[in-house]
Every structure is written in C-alpha cells, then in structure tokens.
Amino acid sequence: MTSLDLAGRTAIITGASRGIGLAMAQRLAEGGANVVLTARSEERAAAAAAQIGSNVLGMAAHAVDEDAARHCIDVTLERFGSIDILINNAGTNPAYGLLTEQDHARFAKVFDVNLWAPLMWTSLAVKAWMGERGGSVINIASVGGLHLTPSMGMYNATKTALIQVTKQLALELSPKVRVNAICPGLVRTRLAEGLWKEQEDPVSSSIALGRIGEPVDVAGAAAFLVSDAASWITGEAMVIDGGQVLGDAPTFRRNADD
C-alpha cells in the first residue's frame, strides 16, 4: 500500500451528488475507498453513485436531518464495516447581500447547514466508530472564511466559524482523529455560478494561476488529506484557490448585486 492508497477504507461524503462533492467521491473511489455519498433526494444520490462504481452507495440525507445522518452511519457500518473518512461538504448560501438586510430565517438556514451539520455528522461518526478506532475528517470551508468578499458576509461568517470548529475538534479528538478544513477559492460549481458566469475572463485574470478552479482541484487535496501521506497534519485550513487571494482581497462581485 502506498501512502496515498485508500484501499479498505470507507468514506462518507455529504452533499456529493454534483460539483466538489461528486469530484471528491470519484477521487476517493479511484484511490480504492468505499464511498457513501449523500444528497437531498434518493434519485440524485443514486444517479451520482451510479456514475462512479460498485464500491459507491448513494443515500438520501438532508445535511441537518439527524435521524437521516444516524441512518446513513448505521447503513455504512452494516455495508462496509467501518467509517474511516468523513467529508462534510454539504453547504448553502441563501443570503447574498448586506448583513443588515438579512433576517433570522436566512440566518438560521445558512448556519444550520454550513456549521451545525458538519459538527453533528462529526459527532455521530466519532461516537459510532472514529472515537475508538480513529479516522480523518475534512470540513469544506472557503477562502471566504479567511478573507472578506462583497455581499457574502453571512456565508463567510459560517465558514470562519467552521474553520474555528475544525481546529477545536482537532484538539479535542486528538490523537485518534485528524480534523482539517479545505478552503476553496472560486470553483466552477453551481453554488458559485453567480460569481463568475457573466464575467469569467476578468475573474480568471484576477487569479494568479489564470483560471477558475475545477472540482477536481479540490478533490486532489481532499484525497491527500485523508491519506497516510497527511498522517501528521491536523487542525489545518488548507487554501486551494489558484492564488486568488494573493495580495488584495478578491475583486469579483456577484452579478445579482445590481
């Protein structure tokens, strides 16, 4: 087994029917891992799993539904016998605009999905398996958790908090469980579409490496962090952004601001 080989390990990835989540599921499966991916609907979860292979199981589970999360963990243990990797990828941003324009309903939704759900899934996985046997957790945060971005204050606040939760969990769960965050920059996903779709050329030129990221760019980093090659890494927030935030803060703005 090489240090990047994931054979014999089992991963749960939330929100993995498309985009970064799907790319991570594909990459981990290619590395030999069994993968359980979740989506909000059974149809989307099954379709995503079918794209990848026989060692992948799709399950319907809304990120904040604790009963669904428990069921997913139970089924994973019954089917594959372990939970070695958890990637908390599910996220939402229903709240573009100024912070002073937000209401409690929006606040509650974005914090529940982006912050509470990763903590809940981690807690359940630790109690069911990882606490005794070890494992690796990745929380998908954002460069927005480290740098200001116009009109995304509430989303960014959840990602800043998630980075702090990641570090706290890394401390509390050591030495059995490693916990890290990945902070993607602008990636070609449906969630981020409003930030680049109508201005791809100028946005790309503002990134040091000259292009918007692809989901596979994040997937490669995730595969490294959950592997033995990263066995001495915990509590880190790894930025994967093509040099987007080198120098000044990001210059792009969401088209819906007007």
Predicted ranges, named:
Residues T2, N93-Y96, H147, A223, ...:
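Short C-terminal tail/terminal secondary-structure segment
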Residues T10, S17-R18:
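Conserved glycine-rich cofactor-binding loop
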Residues G97-L99, D103-F111, V203:
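Substrate-binding pocket helix/loop in short-chain dehydrogenase/reductase
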Residues T122, T158, T166:
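Active-site helix of classical SDR
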Residues K127, A170-P175, S231:
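Alpha-helical segment proximal to the catalytic Tyr-Lys
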Residues S142:
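Residue(s) in the substrate-gating loop at a strand-loop-helix junction
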Residues A181, K197, D201-I233, I240-G242:
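C-terminal helical subdomain
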